[in-house]
Structure formats: C-alpha cells, structure tokens
Amino acid sequence: GEKLGYLPGDMKDKVDPYMQPLYDALNDFLPGKQAAKLIEEKRIEIAPLAFMRGRTLANAFVVLDEAQNATTMQMKMFLTRLGEGSRMVVTGDRTQIDLPRGVPSGLRDAERLLNSIPSISFNYFTSKDVVRHPLVAAIIEAYEADDPPT
C-alpha cells in the first residue's frame, strides 16, 4: 500500500483521501446523512487494509476494494480475517495493477489458488457492465483492443 506516515494530520486525515471512493459509494446508496450516522454508530466501518491484521470479522459484510494492488501476503492476511457469520467481497481490476515491478498481485494469486474451492466464486465484468459515463466503456474497449487482458 501507499505510505501514510508522511501525510499531515492524524490517522483519519491520512487515510480519508484513500477511502473517499467508499464514502462516495455509501452516499450514493444511503439517503441524506444516513451513511455518516451508521459510521458514527460503528455499524459501518471503513478502514485501511493494514488495520485488519489480528482481527476476526464476525457477523459482518466485508469489502476489500481495489484488491489488484494488494500483495499476496496482504491478500492472505485479509482473507483469513473471515469470522463466523460473515461474507467477504473482494473487488479489483486486473488491468489496473500498479504494484512495483516484480511484486505479484494478491488478487491474481487468490484467483489461481482459490478458484477450485466450492464456497468461493469469481465474477468478471466487461465494458458492458460499466455504470460510469458511457465514454468509459469505449475507453476500456480501446485499451483492451490494444492490450488484451491476461
């Protein structure tokens, strides 16, 4: 992950810019200040991947976003936090990996290692699934035509 130590402010100030896409999505789905209220009540928690170490996430719905940039060890650490009564969703785009050269994507490794486990499924989206601006689908298709996904 990104280095947070050099950013100004307390930990919340440091991580909030990275969490903004999640706040945006919550605000799209929950009316008014409902998202803020649920976060304040700790019924919804948004935390950096590094904060998951040592935890067990029981009776929870857990989302790891942008997982293409998790290392293999980060992915293993995250997936092994699964507690009783919980579900996990891991999202990521294999075409947007920006880890340093030679560092494998934990998302790709998880696909390879876990695809035969019956209770784990992988779902893949195409440009037809884009819900952003219509041009985004065309942009994705142009990049795919130039360099097909692996």
Predicted regions and their residues:
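Conserved helicase motor core of SF1/SF2 NTP-dependent helicases
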Residues: 1-64, 68-150
